[in-house]
Amino acid sequence: MSDNDELQQIAHLRREYTKGGLRRRDLPADPLTLFERWLSQACEAKLADPTAMVVATVDEHGQPYQRIVLLKHYDEKGMVFYTNLGSRKAHQIENNPRVSLLFPWHTLERQVMVIGKAERLSTLEVMKYFHSRPRDSQIGSWVSKQSSRISARGILESKFLELKQKFQQGEVPLPSFWGGFRVSLEQIEFWQGGEHRLHDRFLYQRENDAWKIDRLAP
């Protein structure tokens, strides 16, 4: 098959979205109520990694970057994830804290996008979560200088075994370079696939202490 034939095949890949619609009259006043309902349904549907979300940041040149992290907590203050503070994403957030999140629940023909500002979590919040993780995950946090170049996986594996021996007694200490961010909730868009590409999109925008809801064209 030529490259052109393959491209033509990709261009014709499509399907109808038939899982159901989303109507304005069914929307709660608070977007977190709908988010919680959708997240619960994603878990009940046994989606792989239902808390996985794409975090989009930009560097100092305006170049966007995306990666998948796991949502670890959410409330009216925002959505929380944890990371290595030496990572590319952490440096980009330090330079420009405006980010977007995306939950791609394809099987349910849904996605949720969040736009807001990322702020560092307190040491107390980070420490509480860090010590709730499996011990090997805690040790793993010490191993990698995230986003740095390495010559082989064996370097990481050797370092892990070395640190596992070092920390075999007592608690694993919290690395100074490990932390988390809370993304504020300024805008939340809910997308539900619809027949004939007439998808349902609703945008919640915070206005003072209330939420404004608008339907967007698909």
Swiss-Prot record:
Binding-site positions, FMN: 67-72, 82-83, 88-89, 111, 146-147, 191, 201
Catalytic reaction list: pyridoxamine 5'-phosphate + O2 + H2O = pyridoxal 5'-phosphate + H2O2 + NH4(+); pyridoxine 5'-phosphate + O2 = pyridoxal 5'-phosphate + H2O2
Involved pathway(s): Cofactor metabolism; pyridoxal 5'-phosphate salvage; pyridoxal 5'-phosphate from pyridoxamine 5'-phosphate: step 1/1; Cofactor metabolism; pyridoxal 5'-phosphate salvage; pyridoxal 5'-phosphate from pyridoxine 5'-phosphate: step 1/1
E.C. numbers: 1.4.3.5
EC supergroup of this enzyme: oxidoreductase
Family membership: Belongs to the pyridoxamine 5'-phosphate oxidase family.
Subunit comment: Homodimer.
Alphabetic keyword roster: Flavoprotein, FMN, Oxidoreductase, Pyridoxine biosynthesis
A UniProt-annotated Pfam family: PNP_phzG_C
Described purpose of this protein according to its UniProt entry: Catalyzes the oxidation of either pyridoxine 5'-phosphate (PNP) or pyridoxamine 5'-phosphate (PMP) into pyridoxal 5'-phosphate (PLP).
Top-rank taxon, per record: Bacteria
NCBIfam families the record matches: pdxH, PRK05679.1
PROSITE patterns: PYRIDOX_OXIDASE
Co-factor note (free text): Binds 1 FMN per subunit.
InterPro entries to which the protein is assigned, alphabetical: Pyridox_Oxase (IPR000659), Pyridox_Oxase_CS (IPR019740), Pyridox_Oxase_N (IPR011576), Pyridoxamine_oxidase_dimer_C (IPR019576), Split_barrel_FMN-bd (IPR012349)
Organism of this sequence: Escherichia coli O157:H7
One GO term of the biological process aspect: pyridoxine biosynthetic process
GO molecular function: FMN binding; pyridoxamine phosphate oxidase activity
Residue numbers binding substrate: 14-17, 72, 129, 133, 137, 197-199
Protein name in UniProt: Pyridoxine/pyridoxamine 5'-phosphate oxidase
Cofactor: FMN
